[in-house]
Amino acid sequence: MTSTTSGALRRDLGLRDAVVVGLGAMLGAGVFGAVGPAAAAVGPSAPGLLAALALAALVATCNATSTARLAGLHPLAGGAYAYGRRELGDWWGFAAGWAFVVGKTASCAAIALVAGAAVWPEHPGVPAAVAVALFTALTCAGVQRTARVTAVLVVVVLLVLAVSLSAAAGGGLDPTALTSAAAGATPLGVLQGAGLLFFAFAGYARIATLGEEVRDPERTIGRAVAIALVTVLVVYAAVVVVVLGVLGTTTTAASALPLRDAVAAGPAPQLAVLVTVGAAVAALGSLLTVMTGVGRTALAMARDHELPAPLAAISPRSGAPAVAQLVVGAVVVAGVLTTDLRGAIAASSTGVLVYYAVANLAAWARAGRDPRRRAWERPVAAVGLLGCLVLVVALPPAAVAAGLAVLAAGLAGRAVLQGLSARRRAPGRG
């Protein structure tokens, strides 16, 4: 193993490691903080919020199925960036890769700010920057160490959730709160709620970016995605039902941490501090895995000369793309020190959905050319693609405009660089 742009990543991870990485990415700050904003978007309707959760899960399942199928066919680092290049062409691949890098880098900043707010609410950027610096060092140390740390964080979060849900439900749930005010939701509100809850599921893409680092990827990635997604869906459904059953829709919509408030309203309010701790730990766990995924995508793009070549260097000691991880860490630190949570989320939302849209389009195109395809492959990819586009349209216009502007800047930059390169290669020049 050498530190060169042609180096290969090590296949160190098994099924359990891949599942843990996916859970670490999905059981992040969203499980504690996404329910409130989603409830506010949906309106005073518990059935509407449950419908939004179901819609988010449907889109996530279609996306996960498409990405898992492609990851087995193309066991490379980079996720939909690699799939887009192979199945649709270089421009599609670049669009997916750039969308992932931009969206998930902004997500890293948002996640770090959530953790920072739990530690130092008045100045969240300071502890957020410290956490990013520490986790940058961990990602440079190698994916096995990253998976071990993530496993510890996942166990802690699951224990906190189990205790918190039991404590919140200990005083009983109001069944009428889960069935009343069905007419309070609007279609747009449900779609916006689904868009917010979707990002809580979105970490399964992290498993796909491990295509070059898992053993037997064609079998392992699909199983890992399925296990992680089902686990997270059960957890989110439990959180939504308990929170609505204790607080009702109005209080849930106004809460920054609904599960914490539900515990505080139960028979053991002293356990509410566990939710605050759990939110910080969950944010740190997802931060670690998402940062690693961004670095792997940057590595893949640098190998293909879509990003600067030094980003493809692999450390001979750890087997990690250390340069890419250092650059990602530096950008995220700058982000947490210069922007707020709302700005970070606005920059990430559109990018993530564009990434998954390309993945579904690639899966749809692949299935159309493959005589051995299963009958469900194209319909699943079509539903996933349509779901991504609908959720983008349902997002607040300002968020869509900001995300598309950054994506357009990247595409324009690529076009300019390609034009300059073509001119240099033209006869009579140089």
Per-range role (PLM):
Residues M1-G36, A40-P47, A60-T61, T65, ...:
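Membrane-interface "cap" regions at the ends of multi-pass membrane proteins
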Residues A82-G84, G89, P121, A226-M291, ...:
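TM-loop-TM module centered on a large, flexible mid-protein loop between adjacent transmembrane helices
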Residues G116, P124-L173, G184-A185, V225-L229, ...:
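Membrane-interface loop-to-helix entry segments
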Residues V149, L311-A322, Y356-V400, V416, ...:
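C-terminal membrane-solvent junction of multi-pass transporters and transport-like membrane proteins
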Residues A60-V132, T136-C140, A280-A300, Q325, ...:
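Hydrophobic transmembrane alpha-helices that form the core helical bundles
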Residues L9, V42-L50, A64-F94, T251-V263, ...:
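Flexible loop linkers connecting adjacent transmembrane helices
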